[in-house]
Amino acid sequence: MAIAIRLVWATLALGALACAASLQVVEKIPQGPRAVEMFYYRSYAYNNREPSFDERRKWEDVMDERVGTYLREHQDLESTTRYTDFRFWRQVVVGSTREEVRTLLDDPAEQTTDPALMATMAQQHWPVMQARVKEAWVYPPGWVLYFDDNAIVDITRKVGKYDPVY
């Protein structure tokens, strides 16, 4: 009888672990995080609250200046399809350069050139990506930007299985 009870508990524990492991999904998407998403995430992470009106206004002024300075120095961006995403949406997309990403999102939480680590982060998408990816930048909460020698070639995001879809 005691063995049967132990087997039942072991089966339940394994089932719970299997369910918990499958709650997150890595999805490959063409658009990365917006600058405002990172700002809000960092505010919650550091202050455990939403940014105040003054903090938002100050951040928007700083971001306007950074984007304006970058666009003055890189006028060729205006003729690309990424221009609207960069200037108005302030969002990184496939094709964005490292400098554009740093302008919008600041420095990454982690950078790697290790193929094994990148394969772990990309999961099921790695076989398609591995030929062109040279480096990965990680941004919270679950964004990974994959670069070739020049720009972003792929973007993945780890989301909960039950997160809302936008």
Please place each PLM-identified region on the residue numbering:
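Residues within mature, well-folded domains
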Residues: A20-Y166
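Bacterial N-terminal signal peptides
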Residues: L7-A16
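Positively charged n-region of N-terminal signal peptides that target proteins for export
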Residues: M1-R6
